[in-house]
């Protein structure tokens, strides 16, 4: 089932998520690049109406002495047939295409960079994203991660928006399995119809991890987060979040999180 994911470490966001049922060939070495191709489709949704994707990627393209380029191209389309019991044919779905370019730069400004651009289109809905992630060590015991992203979503009937996000985290090894983390982030969403929404969050966490490095896993964190948002953001609250915060424009949460990799 697993094929490929490309994510930002600080906020666990998947820039590319080619994960699903299918088959493919990975990392065919052509010298200048390693090429991977797969056919992905989930036939468990409906017997007569499915959607397939053809993820194609070229990685390890040496564009800089200290950096590499990865290119992702993913076309998608509908596969359908008439239901032989009801004699109803599924409604047409638009074709899709996604193109992503991701450049790594190591050792610049004392750290490692991931610079990305992605554009995808399905019918009348379009998304464009630019992202920069930076990772470094402030001291032998403290790691720093910073991420900034800007998205433009275009959709019919003023259904799109523009989204700016920026955040940073420090992760300090205190001794033994114990760590201390600080995070700060800000999001701004400008919908095509409606007022601009803003939210700023601050988090402090104490953690115990199986290793000295920031990426050591498994880890358990006890965290406290305080967030501040404006009236436009408050009006979008729903469900349990609205039940808890109501007409407030700030709030605090505390929790425990466990994480492991394999």
Regions found by a protein language model. Give the residues of each.
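Outer-membrane beta-barrel "beta-signal"
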Residues: 204, 216, 245-262
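Detector for outer-membrane/organellar transmembrane beta-barrel domains
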Residues: 31-36, 51-191, 197-202, 260
